[in-house]
Amino acid sequence: VHVAGERCARCPACGHSAYPRISPAMMVLIRRGNAILLARHTQSPTRFFTALAGFLEAGESIEDAVHREVFEEVGLKVTNVQYFGSQPWPFPHSLMIAFTADYVSGEIRVDESEIAEAAWFGPDDPFPHVPPLGLSIAGHLIQAHRPRA
């Protein structure tokens, strides 16, 4: 039975409350000087360029997930991981937690199973098609850090 005022269901026989499970996911926008790294994901139907993202693994901190996903998806090392904000994704029961990070080292080497292309975009570069502000936290993250001349 749904419990009024709470996000849980309670068994009428034993009183056990069951709360929905969430799958935490991270998103990170990497900065290098006055440029940001944007990527186009292979599974994206929108063809937007956006920040890197991925799910946490069991036993992993969110910060460790940022470092792991960045290295796995584009072969880069980052530092100065800073919280930006979060957004619930009720379908499929996720919580997207967004960060910024600063580039340390490496050359872009995409994992072709996840990333179609990735590149640095600075203030003098034509800016790619990115998620709009109202669609997701990605749009807000990118616009807040979009390189300006």
Task: State where each predicted segment sits.
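Nudix hydrolase/Nudix homology domain
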Residues: V1-V3, P45-F49, F91, D111-A149
